Amino acid sequence: MADRLTQLQDAVNSLADQFCNAIGVLQQCGPPASFNNIQTAINKDQPANPTEEYAQLFAALIARTAKDIDVLIDSLPSEESTAALQAASLYKLEEENHEAATCLEDVVYRGDMLLEKIQSALADIAQSQLKTRSGTHSQSLPDS
């Protein structure tokens, strides 16, 4: 996962892309300007233009990206953050990391126990198959 500044940079780049795409699509799909009722007869023959739908779509995308940028900015550490606050935050993160490591060790231990049981069961199955095959071979051999 990228750090917050990289995420913020990516979000700003995405916002710029959305602005460029919105301008391009709206320019391409926009109705032509009318000049003193000359274009009205031509415009009536053309199908309905989805410009309004595009405008709403791009407005929603731009608004969502702007909100994401605000959230990322709010999550950045402020200049008012003192060393004591940063140390407390770091201590809390270390505790959470320790708890997660303990949980992970427990899961790995249980996984190892299950693996041993599975390997033991597979070994028993293999032994049973070998005994069955050797018993079948000895029965199929004619006595001379």
Swiss-Prot record:
Q: Does the keyword Transcription regulation apply?
A: yes
A Gene Ontology biological process in which this protein takes part is:
somatic stem cell population maintenance
Provide the primary localization: nucleus
The membrane spanning regions, by residue number, are: none
**Residues in coiled coil:** none
- Alphabetical keyword list: Activator, Nucleus, Transcription, Transcription regulation
The record's function comment reads: Component of the Mediator complex, a coactivator involved in the regulated transcription of nearly all RNA polymerase II-dependent genes. Mediator functions as a bridge to convey information from gene-specific regulatory proteins to the basal RNA polymerase II transcription machinery. Mediator is recruited to promoters by direct interactions with regulatory proteins and serves as a scaffold for the assembly of a functional preinitiation complex with RNA polymerase II and the general transcription factors.
Which family does this protein fall into? Belongs to the Mediator complex subunit 21 family.
Question: What binding partners and quaternary form does the record give?
Answer: Interacts with PPARG. Component of the Mediator complex, which is composed of MED1, MED4, MED6, MED7, MED8, MED9, MED10, MED11, MED12, MED13, MED13L, MED14, MED15, MED16, MED17, MED18, MED19, MED20, MED21, MED22, MED23, MED24, MED25, MED26, MED27, MED29, MED30, MED31, CCNC, CDK8 and CDC2L6/CDK11. The MED12, MED13, CCNC and CDK8 subunits form a distinct module termed the CDK8 module. Mediator containing the CDK8 module is less active than Mediator lacking this module in supporting transcriptional activation.
Q: What is this protein called?
A: Mediator of RNA polymerase II transcription subunit 21
> What gene name is given for the protein in this entry?
MED21
